[in-house]
Amino acid sequence: MKSGEKDYSVKEAMIFSQRIAQLSKALWKCVEKDWQQWIKPYDLNINEHHILTIAYHLKGASISEIAKFGVMHVSTAFNFSKKLEERGYLVFSKKEDDKRNTYIEITDKGEELLLRLMEEYDPENNSVFNGALALRNFYGKFPENIELIAILRNIYGQDFIDIFEKSLEDIEENFTESDQKLVKK
């Protein structure tokens, strides 16, 4: 291959890009609907729930970190965090050695809400989970999505994947199942 030549065709690139776009859009529609139904009784929207979850797993974070790991604009992270603060779920602070960044921490009230939501999670009401159940039943495990994780690592960086993995490890290590509900150990 000559310098500057690509080892893929434009047609191949288009088909791949369109496949990812269509699959992502279809998957997101299901994820969004399921997520909204799950958190609706608690008067939260997806961004607010995501911010609470990130703040919980990071044990405090800057607004920039919330934006990065929540895949949202900094102003979106700030505005929704402000609403959560007004409801008593988060507190804002500045660090002595870093006055430029605003930090948030989940409050006891915010943690209680998040834990209650985790207890209320019902896999039967999750269409993506139910869609993957046949694969688990056949192969004995859920898809691990390693190719998707690799793509996201190349787009967002290793830090993004590390935080994502840490949140899942936190659930694995710090929660147990009791009466078909997820509860903190």
Curated annotation (Swiss-Prot):
Gene3D superfamilies: Winged helix-like DNA-binding domain superfamily/Winged helix DNA-binding domain. GO terms for molecular function: DNA binding; DNA-binding transcription factor activity. The gene is hpr. InterPro entries: HTH_MarR-typ, HTH_tscrpt_reg_Hpr, MarR/SlyA-like, Tscrpt_reg_MarR-type_CS, WH-like_DNA-bd_sf, WH_DNA-bd_sf. Negative regulator of protease production and sporulation. This is HTH-type transcriptional regulator Hpr. Residues 13-157 form the HTH marR-type domain. GO terms for biological process: negative regulation of DNA-templated transcription; regulation of DNA-templated transcription; response to stress; sporulation resulting in formation of a cellular spore. Signal peptide: none annotated. Residues 63-86 bind DNA. Homodimer. It comes from the Bacteria. It comes from Bacillus cereus (strain ATCC 14579 / DSM 31 / CCUG 7414 / JCM 2152 / NBRC 15305 / NCIMB 9373 / NCTC 2599 / NRRL B-3711). Keywords: DNA-binding, Repressor, Sporulation, Transcription, Transcription regulation.
